[in-house]
A protein has these predicted regions:
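Active-site-adjacent segment of SDR/Rossmann-fold oxidoreductases
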Residues: 55, 61, 81-93
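A short, exposed helix-loop element centered on a Lys and neighboring polar residues
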Residues: 30-31, 81
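The catalytic Tyr-X3-Lys active-site helix of short-chain dehydrogenase/reductase
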Residues: 62-75, 79
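Short, flexible catalytic-loop segment of classical short-chain dehydrogenase/reductase
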Residues: 99-109
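Residue(s) in the substrate-gating loop at a strand-loop-helix junction
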Residues: 50
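Substrate-binding pocket helix/loop in short-chain dehydrogenase/reductase
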Residues: 6-7, 14-17
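C-terminal helical subdomain
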Residues: 96, 112-151
């Protein structure tokens, strides 16, 4: 499900359908599966997110057409990270799988095939292989094409620093 349409041109009902599929369904399915996994003391949830979950600060020509889709994927990534933290010690693992473009019919649905020469496309079997390897390695976020794992660690470190710096009780001087 995707709505690659500028938000102002997107039917609010269609946007709501995307949120229902990409956000509400992820929560409901996770909530339904977790009790049995916790009781067994083992299990794994793999939530399919996207590299677009990291795109909020990008200034790229195609980004304005993906606000709802990218926001739902940002939810999936953050939800998965925080759920994994909540479940530490239970034997249940959670992973946000964040591929870029994968060779599926996904992009053909709206009549805009993505298979152009300048777009790197990963094979579905490779995405699955990366996800399962990431689970074995304990990765909460799996980015199949990311060679340098330190880049993901740098993002986490930057997020922690921003979170800590932004928790003051007084306005920053630029807002006074």
């Amino acid at each position: 499900f995707q709505t690659y349409t500028p938000f102002v041109d997107l039917s609010i009902d269609r946007a709501g359908e995307e949120v229902a599929v990409q956000v509400t369904a992820v929560m409901r399915l996770s909530h339904a599966a977790l009790p049995a996994m916790i009781t067994r003391g083992e299990g794994a949830i793999i939530n399919v997110s996207s590299m677009l979950s990291f795109s909020g600060s990008l200034n790229h020509p195609f980004m304005p057409k993906r606000s709802v889709y990218a926001a739902t994927k940002a939810f999936v990534t953050t939800f998965s990270e925080l759920l994994a933290a909540e479940l530490q010690g239970t034997g249940v693992r959670v992973q946000a799988l964040c591929p870029a473009v994968v060779r599926t019919e996904f992009h053909d649905i709206d009549g805009k095939p993505v298979l152009r020469p300048n777009v790197p496309v990963m094979e579905p079997a490779d995405v699955v292989k990366a996800s399962l390897a990431g689970l074995r390695q304990g990765d909460t976020i799996c980015i199949p094409a990311l060679e340098e794992r330190d880049r993901l660690s740098a993002v986490a470190d930057a997020n922690r620093a921003l979170f800590d710096a932004g928790r003051g009780a007084e306005l920053a001087s630029r807002y006074r």
